[in-house]
Amino acid sequence: MELSFKREKICSVEVNLDVPSIEVHSHNLPSYIPGYNGFFMTVEYCDGLVVYATENGIGICNPLLRQIRWIKSKVNYRYNGVGYDNSRPENHYKIFESCPYSDTTVKASITEFVSDAWISKPYEFAYDWDFMSSYSVSLNGALYWVAFHMASDDQFIQSFDFSTEKFEPYCLLPNKKCDPSNARSLAVFRGDRFSYLEQNYETRNIEIWVTKKEIKIENGKAVEWMNLMKVSVPKWSSLREKACIYIAKGDKFHEIIINDLVEYPTRHHRTYVPSLVPVPTFTMSNRSKTQQVESRFTPPRGIQASDGGNEWDDGIFHNVKKINVGVNDFDTVFVKFHYSKYNRIEAGAGHGNATTHNPDDEIMIAGGDYIEAVEGTYTESHITSITFRMRKGDMMPQYGRLNGTPFSLRGERGSKAIGFYGRSSGVHLTALGVHFSPPPLYYSFPNHSPVFNY
């Protein structure tokens, strides 16, 4: 899957490999992201998250979940990549930025986002090398760049390990000598290896290499490269200012021009694997109240009765398996959801007035079924009733009385509820939202390779 970025748009492009064709689905990026319609300086990918650096700062997003978080860049610092400390049990994502300080020293800042507070630490590193490109590759939490030695001009892969917070030369590249005019690209191959592409500036010929074995931060000296393919480009051909999807299958070759989807010179492409990894600390609390309501608690994903109470978010799972609902004489005042993830059942916290909860009053969701919509009513102060519509057409019992404005929360066709969030005051539920999975299009990859455009 390929990510291709274009101003304020994100487009999923479905590519049929059997009958060469594309189908485009376009969505707008949220307008509250500073610099979203400007020039994308850098676009990166890290374990399901896309990170883009504009002139105004850095955005971290999940295109499938349509979650984005924003951090302002440090003045005069250059974004170099995002990763995490792989020695810790949980992935605490970190942003690496640097600023040349002298001919032999670079200043750096590592920003960790595990809470609503952004934590930055200053560092200084001695160096006798430089980046060939600002683009990094994140693999198993570590960062890798194509770099060159200033004295010898030898090009190699430089690494940064967030667990030790150290730079280390990782391995040499197949083409040892650096030609700065050539185009080059380092990428992840088959999930755990590297691929390296280099295009000769004069001949336009392309060579692609891949590593033979899995990449680990500690085994750089053992890396072996093998040549995957060579592409000879005729002298009369020009690949400049031309965006295409090429489909090669057996002895068949097809070219689909997509210039209308990407703009020169602002197009950037990155390999991306769709994921349900949420953007870290996606609570919106660092934005204004108006923006928070617009982004989380507006249909069709969420509803807000009032802004009272404490915000909660159960997170994202694979499915919902059981629901506990509590009511008083009139209204729905308590919910608790039980989720499945990796063949395990995980119980979320209870939300609302737990004294109304009857342990025998629970909704069981049969295997193969899922919640496709949540419906109910609300007043100006709280949610009054709630029910759940299942994929197989069943409507669960209504909890609470029908009182106030009706609401219906649902995802795209084929999406299922995989998590809940909201606000509760201890007496009432004041807001409710649903994390929906991406539509099945993004999971049907046997003969299709979607492409995303920003």
UniProtKB/Swiss-Prot annotation:
- What is this protein's record name? Jacalin-related lectin 37
**Which UniProt keywords are listed?**
Lectin
The organism named in the record is: Arabidopsis thaliana (Mouse-ear cress)
GO MF terms here are: carbohydrate binding
Annotated ranges, domain Jacalin-type lectin: 295-438
| SUPFAM superfamilies xref list | Mannose-binding lectins
Pfam families per the UniProt record, alphabetical? FBA_1, Jacalin
The organism's superkingdom is given as Eukaryota
Family, as annotated: Belongs to the jacalin lectin family.
